[in-house]
Amino acid sequence: MSSWYDAWADRYGDWSSSVTADVPFYVGLARDADGPLVELAVGTGRVAIPVAQATGRCVIGIDSSPAMLAQARVRAVEEGVELDLREGDIRELEIEEPAGLIYCPGRSLLHLPTWADRRRCFERVAAALRSNGRFAWNAFAFDHHVASAIDGQHADTPLPHTNYYSVSDNRVDITLDDGGTGSLWWATKNEWLGLLDVAGLRLEALYGGFAGEPLDDDSREYIFVARR
């Protein structure tokens, strides 16, 4: 997966510059957090940098892509913030001090291919949180009609690619024209809630939008907040 993200890294900033709705949400959680702040799948620092700016604190950022992390380091210096950036697998999360907040923006948990992978990630998150610490993430609210509609569609941005939908396992493959492929394994609400249960985390809130909108049948996003 890291090689696919490496291929996107040079143009990821241009694409993600329009993705801003989640930033105030995660900033708000960070301001409330007592203890270290940890971002999973930190990428180029799209969320971590404004979190560090708003809180005046260092954010630990984990990502498997060296190219993404290299961009995040440059951007952090340019913005004058401190990020502790670490190359690693979020399924093997380990930090030195229990965290007050661990968050995973950008629907990045959907890149974990199996329920077992997500379970491992959630268990490592639970082990890394301090008592009553928070874990927050967002993901597409799965809709097979939407997935079916994009099947076979080609797009030129942020890199030329084609989407393919695998009905059998709720997977959308994003195949770059040069052959690299990244995948999103969509999950239902109950699958996410089951992961919280097995990891020993408790649900605090589930929203359908970053302004705290309630989740309903028209929601296109899950926004979860859980506590240890």
Whereabouts are the PLM-identified features?
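A conserved beta-strand element that flanks and buttresses the S-adenosyl-L-methionine
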Residues: Y103-P105
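A short acidic, Gly/Pro-enriched loop at the edge of an enzyme's catalytic core
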Residues: E94-L101
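C-terminal lobe and adjacent flexible extensions of AdoMet/dcAdoMet transferase-like proteins
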Residues: K189-R228
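SAM-dependent methyltransferase
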Residues: A136-D197
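Class I SAM-dependent methyltransferase SAM/SAH-binding core
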Residues: A48-E92
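Conserved class I S-adenosyl-L-methionine
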Residues: M1-G43
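A short glycine-rich, Lys/Arg-flanked "PGG" loop and its adjoining helix->strand segment in the class I
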Residues: R119-S131
